[in-house]
């Protein structure tokens, strides 16, 4: 049964996903349906966590919008993501960057990998 599930989910995986880690700044081009129209909505921020494996893998992106922190969680292999761009690589020593929620301004910056 487990092999059958693996074969089915293997076909669902998106091969166009770039490699990214927590601390990286990414721009997500998400497809949003409003009524009968479908449009692309950009969401750019820092990846604060990545969890799961295979088809159920998700990542959370955090950005500051109008001085309010906004976090959005996306499945990695969803067809609702039109494109995923890595803007800059960040150097962090944690897998989950929840501590960024309590930091403001320049303290919330992440060092860039050169």
UniProtKB/Swiss-Prot annotation:
Please report which protein family the annotation says this sequence is part of.
Belongs to the bacterial ribosomal protein bL19 family.
Keywords on this record?
Ribonucleoprotein, Ribosomal protein
Gene that encodes it: rplS
| InterPro entries attached to this UniProt entry | Ribosomal_bL19, Ribosomal_bL19_CS, Ribosomal_bL19_sf, Translation_prot_SH3-like_sf
**What functional role does this protein have?**
This protein is located at the 30S-50S ribosomal subunit interface and may play a role in the structure and function of the aminoacyl-tRNA binding site.
GO biological process, any: translation
Could you tell me which species this protein originates from?
Listeria welshimeri serovar 6b (strain ATCC 35897 / DSM 20650 / CCUG 15529 / CIP 8149 / NCTC 11857 / SLCC 5334 / V8)
* Protein's name in the database: Large ribosomal subunit protein bL19
User: From the UniProt record, which GO molecular function terms apply?
Assistant: structural constituent of ribosome
Q: GO cellular-component terms in the record?
A: cytosolic large ribosomal subunit
């Amino acid at each position: 049964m487990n092999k059958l599930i693996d074969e089915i989910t293997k076909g669902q995986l998106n091969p166009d996903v770039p490699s990214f880690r927590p601390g990286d700044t990414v721009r997500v081009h998400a497809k949003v349906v409003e009524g009968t129209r479908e449009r692309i909505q950009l969401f750019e921020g820092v990846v604060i966590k990545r969890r799961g494996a295979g088809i159920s893998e998700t990542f959370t992106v955090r950005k500051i919008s109008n001085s309010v922190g906004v976090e959005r969680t996306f499945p990695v292999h969803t067809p609702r993501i039109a494109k995923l761009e890595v803007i800059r690589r960040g150097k962090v020593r944690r897998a989950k960057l929840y501590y960024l929620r309590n930091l403001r301004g320049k303290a919330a910056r992440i060092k860039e990998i050169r």
